[in-house]
C-alpha cells in the first residue's frame, strides 16, 4: 500500500513541474510574439514617418513650383500688349505633299480603268463596211438604211469584234463598261458583235443573257436580236413574266430537254425565278452577259439578282451534285463514283464576258464590284475637255452624265396654271410628236383627260394618248404603235416610258413635272434626239422649282446651252381660257360622280 501511495505522491509534483515549464514556454512565445509585433509596428511607423516626410517635401516643392509659375504668368500679363489676330501656324504644303506623294487628287482613289477611260468624241462616226463585220450583217444594216455608226459604235464594235474573233468558246478580252447618252446606239453596239460571234457555234446553248429593267425594253431588245439573227441559224427568247415558268422553260428547252435558245433577254426578277425554281436552267455555257440600263438595275435589288446570278455563274447548280449529272453512273467506273461529289474543281475557266451599258453609268467602285468584272475597260462618249474639272477631280461625285449633242433644251418658266400654259406652249410653238412626262400615274391620267376636254370644247382635232404602268401590256403596245405611226400627236406618260424604249419619230419631250433626279432627267429627254436626229426638251418650271432644276441641269455635259423662255397667263387667248375653265368644271364633275355615284343629280 505504501508503494502505491508513494507513486501517487511522487507523480503529482511531476505534473505540476511540467505545467510550470509549459507556462513558462508559453509566456516566452507570447513575449516573442509581442516583441515581433512591436518591432513590425515600429518598422511600419518608421516607414510611415519617412513617407510622410517625403510627401511633405514633395508638397512643398509643388507649392514652390506653383508660386514660380504664377509669378511667370504675372510677368507675361504685365508685358502683354494688344495686337491683331495672327493665323495659326500650318504645315507647309510642300512638306505635306512630300510626306505623302500618293495623295494627288481624287482620281488616284479610283481603279486605273475607271480613272483612265477610253474617251470618244460624240461627233465620231465610222463606216460599218470598214469594220470587221460579216457581209450578211452589213447587208441587214443597209436594209435599215444604216451605213455609218455613231460614236459609241465606233468605240465599242472594234473592241468586241476583236474579243469574239475566235468564236463562242474563247474570249481574249476583258469586260467592257460603256457610258453614252440615250439614243446613241448602245443596243446595236452589242447586238452586232454578239450575233457575229455566236454565228460560229455548232451546238445550241444558252450563250448570252441580256438583263433589262422593264418588260417593254425586253421585247424591244429581243426584236433587234431577231432581225439581225435572220439567216444565221440563231434563236432569241424574251422572258417578261407574262407566261408561267413551265411555258418559259419549254421555250428554252422544248420537249427533248435540249437547249434550243442562243440568246435570252429577261428582266432580273424573272431570271432569278428560273435560277431558284427551275432545276434544268443553267448559265454554265454563257459567253456574254449584257446589263442594259445598268444604273437602275444596280440601284435596286430585284430579289438580290446580282448575287444570285453571280453565284450561278461561278457555281452552276447542275454541277454541284453528281446526282444532277445525267448517265454519270453509266459512263464512269463504280470505283471512282464515291470520289466524285462535284465537278466544279474540274471545270475549265469560263469564256464569259460582261458588257455593262448605261446613259448614267456610276463610277462608284463599291457598286461595280458586285458585278465581279474581269480586266474591265471603260468607254465614255463625251468631249475630252469635259472629262474632269479644273482641279483634276471627277465631276459629280464620280458619276458620268451626258446629253445627246443634237438636243436643244428649254427652261420654261410658268405659273401655277400649268395645264393651260402647256396647251398654249404646244400650239404657239407648233409642237408635234410629243412625249409629256408627269410625276405619277394618277397625275398623268388627270392631265390626259383635261387636255381631251379642252380639245372637245375648242372642237380641235388634236389627238392625245395615255401611257402608264396601270395599262395592260397589250394596251401599251397599241398606244406605242399609234404614236409611232402618227395617229397620236401627244402621249402623256409616266417615267415607265423613260427607260430605254425607242419610240420612233419622237421630236419633242415635255417635262410637265420636273424630274427629281438628274438620272430621271437624262432618261426622259433621251427619248428624243436619238440616232443623230434633232430633238427638243421643254421643262415647265415654277418659281419654287427653279433653284432645284438649275442645280440639277448643271451636272450635265452638253453641246448646246439651255435656252430660257417665260410663259405668263396674260399671253393666253381668251378662247383658250374659256375652254380651260369649262374643261376644269367638267373634270370636277366626272371625278365627283366617279367617287359618289349615288349623288350624281346633286351636281348635274
Swiss-Prot record:
It is an enzyme of class 3 (hydrolase). Residues 406-573 form the Helicase C-terminal domain. A motif (DEAD box) lies at residues 292-295. ATP binds at residues 180-187. The keyword Chaperone does not apply. Keywords: ATP-binding, Helicase, Hydrolase, Nucleotide-binding, Nucleus, Ribosome biogenesis, RNA-binding, rRNA processing. GO terms for molecular function: ATP binding; ATP hydrolysis activity; RNA binding; RNA helicase activity. Residues 1-16 have a biased composition (Basic and acidic residues). A motif (Q motif) lies at residues 149-157. One of its GO terms (cellular component) is cytosol. It catalyses: ATP + H2O = ADP + phosphate + H(+). InterPro entries: DEAD/DEAH_box_helicase_dom, Helicase_ATP-bd, Helicase_C-like, P-loop_NTPase, RNA-helicase_DEAD-box_CS. It is found in: Nucleus, Nucleolus. Pfam families: DEAD, Helicase_C. It comes from the Eukaryota. One of its GO terms (biological process) is rRNA processing. Residues 1-37, 51-70 are annotated as: Disordered. Residues 167-379 form the Helicase ATP-binding domain. Residues 51-60 have a biased composition (Low complexity). Its EC number is 3.6.4.13. ATP-binding RNA helicase involved in the biogenesis of 60S ribosomal subunits and is required for the normal formation of 25S and 5.8S rRNAs. Associated with pre-ribosomal particles. The Q motif is unique to and characteristic of the DEAD box family of RNA helicases and controls ATP binding and hydrolysis. PANTHER family: RNA HELICASE. This is ATP-dependent RNA helicase dbp6. It comes from Schizosaccharomyces pombe (strain 972 / ATCC 24843).
Amino acid at each position: 500500500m505504501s508503494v502505491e501511495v508513494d507513486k501517487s505522491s511522487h507523480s503529482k509534483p511531476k505534473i505540476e513541474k511540467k505545467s510550470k515549464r509549459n507556462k513558462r514556454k508559453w509566456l516566452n512565445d507570447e513575449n516573442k510574439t509581442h516583441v515581433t509585433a512591436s518591432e513590425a509596428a515600429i518598422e511600419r511607423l518608421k516607414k510611415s514617418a519617412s513617407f510622410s516626410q517625403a510627401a511633405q517635401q514633395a508638397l512643398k516643392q509643388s507649392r514652390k513650383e506653383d508660386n514660380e509659375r504664377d509669378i511667370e504668368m504675372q510677368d507675361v500679363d504685365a508685358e502683354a500688349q494688344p495686337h491683331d489676330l495672327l493665323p495659326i501656324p500650318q504645315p507647309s504644303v510642300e512638306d505635306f505633299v512630300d510626306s505623302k506623294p500618293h495623295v494627288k487628287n481624287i482620281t488616284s482613289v479610283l481603279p486605273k480603268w475607271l480613272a483612265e477611260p477610253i474617251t470618244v468624241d460624240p461627233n465620231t462616226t465610222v463606216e460599218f463596211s470598214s469594220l470587221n463585220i460579216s457581209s450578211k450583217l452589213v447587208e441587214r444594216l443597209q436594209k435599215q438604211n444604216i451605213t455609218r455608226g455613231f460614236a459609241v459604235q465606233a468605240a465599242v464594235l472594234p473592241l468586241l469584234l476583236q474579243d469574239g474573233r475566235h468564236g463562242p468558246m474563247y474570249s481574249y478580252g476583258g469586260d467592257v463598261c460603256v457610258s453614252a447618252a440615250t439614243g446613241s446606239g448602245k443596243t446595236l453596239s452589242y447586238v452586232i458583235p454578239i450575233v457575229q460571234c455566236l454565228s460560229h457555234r455548232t451546238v445550241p446553248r444558252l450563250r448570252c443573257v441580256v438583263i433589262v429593267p422593264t418588260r417593254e425594253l425586253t421585247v424591244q431588245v429581243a426584236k433587234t436580236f431577231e432581225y439581225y439573227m435572220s439567216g444565221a441559224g440563231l434563236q432569241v427568247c424574251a422572258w417578261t413574266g407574262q407566261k408561267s415558268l413551265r411555258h418559259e422553260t419549254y421555250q428554252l428547252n422544248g420537249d427533248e430537254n435540249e437547249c434550243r435558245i442562243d440568246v435570252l433577254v429577261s428582266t432580273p426578277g424573272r431570271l432569278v425565278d428560273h435560277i431558284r425554281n427551275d432545276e434544268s436552267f443553267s448559265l454554265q455555257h454563257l459567253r456574254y452577259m449584257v446589263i442594259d440600263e445598268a444604273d437602275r438595275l444596280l440601284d435596286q435589288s430585284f430579289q438580290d439578282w446580282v448575287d444570285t446570278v453571280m453565284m450561278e455563274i461561278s457555281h452552276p447548280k447542275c454541277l454541284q451534285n453528281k446526282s444532277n449529272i445525267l448517265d454519270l453512273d453509266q459512263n464512269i467506273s463504280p470505283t471512282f463514283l464515291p470520289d466524285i461529289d462535284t465537278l466544279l474543281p474540274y471545270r475549265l475557266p469560263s469564256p464569259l464576258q460582261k458588257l455593262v451599258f448605261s446613259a448614267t453609268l456610276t463610277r462608284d467602285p463599291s457598286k461595280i464590284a458586285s458585278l465581279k468584272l474581269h480586266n474591265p475597260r471603260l468607254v465614255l462618249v463625251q468631249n475630252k475637255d469635259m472629262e474632269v474639272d479644273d482641279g483634276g477631280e471627277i465631276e459629280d461625285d464620280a458619276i458620268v452624265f451626258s446629253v445627246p449633242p443634237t438636243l436643244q433644251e428649254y427652261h420654261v418658266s410658268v405659273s401655277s396654271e400649268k395645264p393651260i400654259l402647256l396647251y398654249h406652249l404646244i400650239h404657239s410653238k407648233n409642237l408635234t410628236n410629243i412625249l409629256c412626262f408627269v410625276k405619277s400615274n394618277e397625275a398623268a391620267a388627270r392631265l390626259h383627260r383635261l387636255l381631251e376636254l379642252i380639245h372637245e370644247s375648242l372642237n380641235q382635232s388634236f389627238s392625245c394618248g395615255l401611257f402608264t404602268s396601270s395599262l395592260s401590256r397589250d394596251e401599251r403596245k397599241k398606244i406605242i404603235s399609234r404614236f409611232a405611226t402618227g395617229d397620236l400627236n401627244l402621249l402623256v406618260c409616266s417615267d415607265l416610258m423613260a427607260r430605254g424604249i425607242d419610240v420612233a419619230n419622237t421630236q419633242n419631250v415635255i417635262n410637265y413635272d420636273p424630274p427629281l433626279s438628274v438620272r430621271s432627267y437624262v432618261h426622259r429627254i433621251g427619248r428624243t434626239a436619238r440616232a443623230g436626229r434633232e430633238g427638243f426638251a421643254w421643262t415647265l418650271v415654277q418659281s419654287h422649282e427653279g433653284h432645284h432644276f438649275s442645280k440639277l441641269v448643271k451636272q450635265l455635259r452638253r453641246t448646246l446651252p439651255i435656252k430660257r423662255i417665260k410663259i405668263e397667263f396674260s399671253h393666253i387667248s381668251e378662247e383658250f381660257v374659256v375652254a380651260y375653265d369649262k374643261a376644269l368644271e367638267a373634270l370636277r364633275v366626272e371625278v365627283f360622280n366617279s367617287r359618289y355615284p349615288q349623288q350624281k343629280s346633286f351636281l348635274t
